A protein has these predicted regions:
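Short connector loops/turns at beta-strand edges and beta->alpha or beta->beta junctions
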Residues: 132-142, 171, 259, 446-447, ...
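Short aromatic-glycine motifs in intrinsically disordered, low-complexity regions
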Residues: 31-33, 268-269, 454-458
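Core alpha/beta nucleotide-donor-binding catalytic domains of modification enzymes
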Residues: 2-9, 15, 19-169, 180-194, ...
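Class I S-adenosyl-L-methionine
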Residues: 118-120, 138-411
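Polybasic, glycine- and aromatic-enriched phosphate-binding surface used to engage nucleic acids
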Residues: 367-479
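Extracellular structured ligand-interaction cores
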Residues: 7-10, 39, 124, 235, ...
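Active-site-proximal structural scaffolding
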Residues: 3-6, 13, 45, 189, ...
Length: 479
């Protein structure tokens, strides 16, 4: 009698630092056993791969038996190479599953061989991940073939490579994740998403092979109806905040089930998300630093104190909230000595997370150090804008638009006036409101700091990497 399969192999393409794979890895059975095992995870970026490898390494230890060396590494007492040398067996296993490879024609044979080896004769496994969103800008292959350089475009290769991997290995199930923007993207006036649905339904036909044979039924995770080419593709959209995630992240998830299988996925169960305050409010308060001219607590306070309440009152010209905003600014300026003194903190208290059930798996009772909780440096002018914006949000319950700023605080950019009059983006300085979920966290946080202003005026800064990671539901020990 065949042995019952206790966990399902997962092949993770375009894995990044491992976020999607982490979700599968944390899915447990009735006895607490892992339901999925990542046997191949492929990522080409060096830094993302380092994070991916470390996480695969950690998964080879039981949750209640993680080595103290891992926590010593997080505390900076040993480096990553020391950690791996002390646990060579686990490192060897992780190195075999977390792979730094560029997907494409040059590595197609290698990737095919690796997946064949790891899947072997297993009949129940899943392919997860999806090509970077840029791949779909050239998805209309039949209409684009005449364009110079199309065949050499990497984006074209990435999308075709994804389809070829499906054809090569015929996974029973695939889960393709991608950006909401696919719903509005068009090539030659035709919706890109329609072509993608057609390609995923019949992958062989998509690459010019036979029109019959391998095929998939495509399902939504948020709706009962099975979408097809004639059904509104918006059914594939998953609004993360509807399912317990503390950010308004809207992503497309297409679940493909091979045609010969008589199964269908269930729907995600909606439940309320934790608020921003519940998710990051327990982290140590840290102040921003000054990016130019040297940083010190005294100079930082002096720069913020230059925000003149009288000027603000005059320029707001008696708006509804003027008195409360001015009062809030003056109160915080006089209490400046009681705010955070440092721009970083490694202190971690295991019970700092609020009691929301969606946050329970972020904890690690053995962790005593916090990584990546360091505020960015900002220009003095931005400090005052952040301070004003967070006070405004505290008083009004909303993030200010450009038209809500005193002119003395506005940057001297042409786009600012266009924003004030509604002709361009009107909210380049966006406060993350404490009693709501966060707006979507981007992968380039350092470039988009203005969009992620902390709600606490006394900290006067954008979100730290650790705060952003927590809002993306990475566990607190993810490094």
């Amino acid at each position: 009698m065949a042995k019952e399969q206790t966990s399902y192999p997962v092949v993770d393409l375009f894995a990044g630092p491992g976020g999607l794979g982490e979700g599968f890895a944390t899915a447990l059975g009735e006895r607490g056993e892992p339901r999925f095992e990542s046997v191949v995870a492929i990522e080409r970026d060096e830094f993302s791969h380092q994070t991916l490898l470390l996480r695969h390494f950690l998964r080879h230890f039981a949750t209640d038996a993680r080595p103290d060396d891992y926590y010593r590494y997080l505390r900076g007492e040993i480096d990553r190479n020391d950690l791996y040398r002390r646990h060579t067996a686990e490192f060897k296993k992780a190195s075999a599953s977390a792979l730094k490879i560029s997907l494409g024609p040059e590595n197609h044979a290698l990737v095919k061989r690796l997946i064949d080896q790891r899947i072997a004769d297993c009949r129940r496994w899943a392919l997860v991940g999806g090509p970077p969103c840029q791949a779909y800008s050239l998805v209309g292959r039949s209409r684009m073939m005449g364009q110079p350089g199309f065949e050499q475009d990497e984006r074209h290769f990435l999308y075709l490579e994804y389809l070829k991997i499906i054809i090569d290995h015929q996974p029973p199930v695939f889960v393709m994740e991608n950006v909401k923007g696919l719903l509005s993207a068009k090539i030659g006036g035709q919706p890109v998403i329609n072509r993608i649905v057609s390609d995923l339904t019949s992958p062989k036909m998509a690459v010019g092979n036979e029109a019959n044979g391998l095929g998939y039924k495509l399902y939504s995770l948020s709706e009962d109806e099975r979408p097809g080419e004639e059904v509104d593709p918006r059914l594939f959209l998953v609004r993360a905040e509807d399912y317990g995630v503390p950010q308004a992240r809207h992503r497309m998830f297409i679940v493909g089930i091979r045609n010969d299988l008589n199964v269908r996925p269930g729907r995600l169960r909606p439940h309320a998300p934790p608020t921003l305050r519940q998710t990051i409010g327990g982290l140590p308060a840290v102040r921003s630093s000054l990016s130019k001219g040297g940083d010190s607590l005294e100079r930082w306070r002096d720069e913020i104190a230059q925000l003149a309440s009288s000027d603000i009152a005059r320029q707001l010209n008696g708006s509804q909230y003027t008195r409360d905003i001015v009062k809030g600014i003056e109160l915080l300026k006089t209490q400046g000595g009681h705010g955070p003194r440092s721009s970083s903190s490694a202190r971690y208290e295991a019970d700092a997370l609020a009691g929301h059930p969606a946050l329970s798996y972020l904890r690690d009772k053995n962790l005593d150090v916090l990584t990546a909780h360091e505020a960015r440096g900002h220009m003095p002018s931005d400090l005052r804008r952040y301070f004003y914006a967070s006070v405004y949000a505290d008083v009004t319950g909303r993030s200010p638009k450009l038209s809500d700023f005193p002119k003395s605080l506005l940057p001297a950019h042409q786009n600012v006036e266009l924003g004030r009059t509604g002709k361009m983006f009107s909210d380049p300085f966006r406060v993350q409101l404490p009693d709501q979920v966060a707006t979507p966290i981007t992968s380039h946080l350092s470039k988009d700091g203005h969009y992620f202003i902390h709600y606490d005026p006394s900290q006067c800064r954008s979100l730290t990497v650790r705060e952003a990671a927590r809002l993306q539901t990475f566990p607190v020990n993810y490094s």
